[in-house]
Every structure is written in C-alpha cells, then in structure tokens.
A protein has these predicted regions:
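PLP-dependent amino-acid enzyme catalytic core
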Residues: 1-141
C-alpha cells in the first residue's frame, strides 16, 4: 500500500480513530448534561466504546460505561475474563457490525480500565431491541 502512496487506517485499533469516535461522547454529554447514569455502547473491535468511554470518564467518571456484545461475538468479555486478548474461533454474523473475533490491542488496553461492566445479548434480544426502536421512533419516519 505504501508504495502506491496509500495509507492504511485501522477501523478500530488506531489512536486517531478512537479519539474521533470519542466525539460521540462529547455529543452525548452536551445533549444530556445532567441526566445520565450509564451509557450502553455496542462493542466489536472496541474503538467506538474506547473513544466514548475515554471522553466521558475524563469529564464524568461517575457515569457507568456498559459495553454490550452479541453473545456469539463476545471478544471483549472473553479478553477481560482471561486478562489478555483472546481470538474467538468463530463469531456470529447477525450483528455483523460488531462481529469481530479479537478485540483490538489498544482498545483492550483502554477498555479494561474504563468499562464498568460487559453484558452479552442474544440474537433474539437484538431482534427485540430493533423492533422496539422501530415501534418507538421508526414509524414516525416511514
């Protein structure tokens, strides 16, 4: 790639990408300045969660950061339990945006310090949540 003048930017395990994703944390705190007890963040490779958590914990350490993973792609949960990054043998693909076999090196370093809890959800729970969001706000935009 370099010989062609191209630069590879890792989709989640890059400090600049993580910092950029932290701006979502800034938006959350701006829009909900006093009403927040916890933020639930989907985790694949961990960049989004690491960015949001780093920003939020710096300004509002009392806010709980809850990482949410599909139970068939729970690479952060496995890494935290093992206290090291773990490569899953297989990952489910229903939640394809978070279907990652191994949490990033930099994201794991951050998340093991910043995340208050990791929860896993089943495909059925993901489907139910999609339906709930559609019923709550989706119909207004159809």
């Amino acid at each position: 790639m370099a010989e062609q003048g191209l630069t590879y930017i890792h989709p989640f395990d890059d400090p600049d990408v993580i910092a950029g994703q932290g701006t979502i944390g800034m938006e959350i705190l701006r829009q909900l300045p006093e009403q927040l007890d916890a933020i639930f963040i989907a985790v694949g490779g961990g960049g989004l969660c690491a960015g949001i958590a780093a920003y939020v914990k710096q300004l509002r350490p009392e806010i709980k950061i809850i990482a949410v993973e599909s139970d068939d792609a729970a690479c952060l949960d496995a890494a935290i339990k093992a206290d090291r990054r773990v490569r899953l043998k297989q990952v489910g693909i229903f939640a394809d945006g978070t279907a990652v076999a191994q949490i990033g090196k930099e994201t794991f370093r951050l998340l093991k310090e910043l995340v208050d809890e990791v929860i896993t959800v089943s495909t059925d729970e993901i489907c139910a949540a999609i339906k709930d969001v559609y019923n709550e706000i989706g119909r207004a935009h159809v």
